[in-house]
């Protein structure tokens, strides 16, 4: 009987395979030692520092120890909760906090961070988290350290390394209460505006819905435009004060328009609407020119307009005649009348069915004493918009001639009376 043939086997030393899920021990101290040793060798030559950091990324685990890396570059060592150094013995003076407190030095440090994050893109998120943390630790830093961090943050916001959403950390209740947030914001915005300008700052703030929150840098009892304006103007940031004031005005305008439309749709008496608008004008320092534009827009949005050109003019005249007393209450200045004329021109141009209604609307408002001769003549002569001007000027030609003749007649009558 044939014996079953044995299969050949491989013999030799067996190696123990490492478990795939066995993770390397988290050891930030060893990482810290490597970075600090390297920084000690480079000294304060920031070009050399940037090169060292660039090269070290290939050998050290930046992804894992991002927080430790940024702690060292900013504070000189690992930070404990609250902002103190975790180990005061292991630290380096090649860091933001140990550097000179001036804009030029902070600009040089900003370049170090820029180069590092451009080289290792994955550090972007870690760096943002680090800055958010540092802002929450502000009370744990000295005034000089806060100033340096503020300048650096402003520069990094200006060049796009940081996103303006990091400013959320400044709204921390304790930081606000003790005035730390506002003082920090002064230095930050100064360096930010120095790098760019207020318009660029405004765009960045708007992107993260921070444009209307700057007053939250102060406690609730001091959250007024007046207080903000005084504080930042005295600190040399008049452009920021004006920006916030403008933002408040824009917000007030939107609120005014919304309320106006609601009052009109309810059919509130004009005297009540006029009283409300005048109070809002006074409270929010809104000009009559701005208000007349808002009222015009609100009046025109309260009705469903006929799509037929031959019918819309009649509908418009009927509708606007009803609202003439309201409009007349806010055309007490020549400039307001001119603003209204331009708004009418713009509306008639943008809404093609109204192209032939322009002259009829102007005549209606003239008869209703919403508009007077002088602004109409000025509009006709040189103050009109380019939009559809040939059409509208032609429409107005006969009426303007009539106005001029009427004006001449009244002048000659006045002379005869003299």
From Swiss-Prot:
CDD domains: W2_eIF5C_like. GO terms for cellular component: cytoplasm. InterPro entries: ARM-type_fold, eIF5-mimic_regulator, W2_BZW1/2, W2_domain. Keywords: Activator, Transcription, Transcription regulation, Translation regulation. Residues 1-25 are annotated as: Disordered. The keyword Transcription regulation applies. Residues 246-413 form the W2 domain. It comes from the Eukaryota. PROSITE patterns: W2. Residues 1-14 have a biased composition (Polar residues). Transmembrane segments: none annotated. Translation initiation regulator which may repress repeat-associated non-AUG (RAN) initiated translation probably by acting as a competitive inhibitor of eukaryotic translation initiation factor 5 (EIF5) function. Enhances histone H4 gene transcription but does not seem to bind DNA directly. Belongs to the BZW family. This is eIF5-mimic protein 2. The lineage of its organism: Eukaryota, Metazoa, Chordata, Craniata, Vertebrata.
């Amino acid at each position: 009987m044939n014996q079953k043939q044995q299969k050949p086997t491989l013999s030799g030393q067996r190696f123990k395979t490492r478990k795939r899920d066995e993770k390397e021990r988290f050891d930030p101290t060893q990482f810290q030692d490597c970075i600090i040793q390297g920084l000690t060798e480079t000294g304060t030559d920031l070009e050399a520092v940037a090169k060292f950091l660039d090269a070290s990324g290939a050998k050290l685990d930046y992804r894992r120890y991002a927080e430790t890396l940024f702690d060292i570059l900013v504070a000189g060592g690992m930070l404990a909760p609250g902002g103190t150094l975790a180990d005061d013995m292991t630290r380096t003076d090649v860091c933001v906090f140990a550097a000179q407190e001036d804009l030029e030095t902070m600009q040089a440090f900003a370049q170090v961070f820029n180069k590092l994050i451009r080289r290792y893109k994955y550090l972007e998120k870690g760096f943002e988290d680090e800055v958010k943390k540092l802002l929450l630790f502000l009370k744990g830093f000295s005034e000089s350290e806060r100033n340096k961090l503020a300048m650096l943050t402003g520069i990094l916001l200006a060049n796009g390394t940081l996103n303006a959403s990091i400013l959320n950390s400044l709204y921390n209740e304790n930081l606000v209460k003790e005035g730390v947030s506002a003082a920090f914001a002064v230095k930050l915005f100064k360096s930010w505006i120095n790098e760019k300008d207020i318009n660029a700052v405004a765009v960045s703030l708007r992107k993260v819905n921070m444009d209307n929150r700057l007053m939250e840098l102060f406690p609730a009892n001091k959250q007024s435009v007046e207080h903000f304006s005084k504080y930042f103007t005295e600190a040399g940031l008049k452009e920021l004060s004006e920006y916030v004031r403008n933002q408040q005005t824009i917000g007030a305008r939107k609120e005014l328009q919304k309320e106006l439309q609601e009052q009109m749709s309810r059919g509130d008496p004009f005297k009540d609407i006029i009283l409300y608008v005048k109070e809002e004008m006074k409270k929010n320092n809104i000009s009559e020119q701005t208000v007349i534009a808002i009222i015009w827009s609100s009046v025109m949005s309260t009705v469903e307009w006929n799509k037929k050109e031959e019918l819309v003019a009649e509908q418009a005249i009927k509708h606007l005649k009803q609202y003439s007393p309201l409009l007349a209450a806010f055309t007490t200045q020549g400039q307001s009348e001119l603003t209204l004329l331009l708004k009418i021109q713009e509306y008639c141009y943008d809404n093609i069915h109204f192209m032939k209604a322009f002259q009829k609307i102007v005549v209606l408002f003239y008869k209703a004493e919403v508009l007077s001769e002088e602004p109409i003549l000025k509009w006709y002569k040189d103050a009109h918009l380019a939009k559809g001007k040939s059409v509208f000027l032609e429409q107005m030609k006969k009426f303007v001639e009539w106005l001029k003749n009427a004006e001449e007649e009244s002048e000659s009558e006045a002379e005869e009376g003299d």
